[in-house]
From Swiss-Prot:
Primary role: Cleaves peptides in various proteins in a process that requires ATP hydrolysis. Has a chymotrypsin-like activity. Plays a major role in the degradation of misfolded proteins.
Gene that encodes it: clpP3
Classification of source organism: Bacteria, Bacillati, Cyanobacteriota, Cyanophyceae, Synechococcales
Domain of life: Bacteria
Transmembrane intervals: none
Gene3D superfamilies per record: 2-enoyl-CoA Hydratase, Chain A, domain 1 (3.90.226.10)
Subunit structure: Fourteen ClpP subunits assemble into 2 heptameric rings which stack back to back to give a disk-like structure with a central cavity, resembling the structure of eukaryotic proteasomes.
UniProt keyword annotation of Hydrolase present: yes
Stored NCBIfam families: clpP (TIGR00493), PRK00277.1 (NF001368), PRK12553.1 (NF009205)
HAMAP family with a match to the protein in the record: ClpP (MF_00444)
Name of the featured protein: ATP-dependent Clp protease proteolytic subunit 3
GO molecular-function terms, A-Z: ATP-dependent peptidase activity; ATPase binding; serine-type endopeptidase activity
CDD domains tied to this protein: S14_ClpP_2
Length: 216
């Protein structure tokens, strides 16, 4: 059996092991209208303001939700920016690339904002926002590294999976070099191990464009 999922070692030790938010946990916003009151969960209300969130590990389910939200917002208004808030330790490379490809394909600019931690695929998506609109809050942390993975089974199966991980590593490094302006050699060197940056260091590196002190 082959484990094809590329994983990131900074797991929930960087984030609390929180349960999935249910109806009794998510804050609810009540709006008044001529037809009476309407209740929205907070994320649905923010979606109306074109604000979406990546606040967990990256997986296929999260990718499907974010892709759907971006496509919906593009259909609503193909010109107005979409804001993507990121607080994620990373996760599946293929799921992350699905989000990334959609960010590049939709017409609206994607404003990325790091709050908390953007690590591994989270940092990659942060850097993949529209140029000049990649932001971070002052006490957030950003980390880049190479994809990890594991395989088991016959030797030939392990070899196939190793080649796939190397392919994904090359793909991510090339894209990071494109988005940061760093050389491919430097990206390869810096991602060989966990490479943590402060927001200001991320600006100097080219991962983001600005540290913001106010959300207004």
């Amino acid at each position: 059996m082959i484990n094809t999922k590329c994983i990131h070692p900074v797991q929930n030790k960087w984030k609390g092991d929180l349960p999935c938010s249910g109806p009794g946990v998510l804050p609810t916003v009540i709006e008044q209208s001529g037809r009476g009151e309407r209740a929205f969960d907070i994320y649905s209300r923010l979606l109306r303001e074109r604000i979406i969130f990546l606040g967990t590990d990256v997986n296929d389910q999260i990718a499907d939700a974010l892709v759907a939200q971006m496509l919906f917002l593009e259909a609503e208004d193909p010109e107005k920016d979409i804001q993507l808030y990121i607080n994620s330790p990373g996760g599946s490379v293929t799921a992350g690339l699905a989000i990334y490809d959609t960010m590049q394909q939709v017409n609206p600019d994607i404003v990325t904002m790091c709050y908390g931690l953007a690590a591994s695929m989270g940092a990659f998506l942060l850097a993949g926002g529209s140029k000049g609109k990649r932001l971070a809050l002052p006490n957030s942390r950003i980390m880049i590294h190479q994809p990890l993975g594991g395989a088991q089974g016959q030797a030939v199966e392990i070899e196939i999976q190793a080649k796939e991980i190397l392919f994904l590593k090359e793909t991510l490094n090339n894209l990071l070099a494109e988005h940061t302006g760093q050389s491919l050699e430097k990206i390869s060197e810096d991602t060989d191990r966990d490479h943590f940056l402060s927001p200001q260091e991320a600006v100097e590196y080219g991962l983001i464009d600005k540290v913001v002190n106010s959300l207004n």
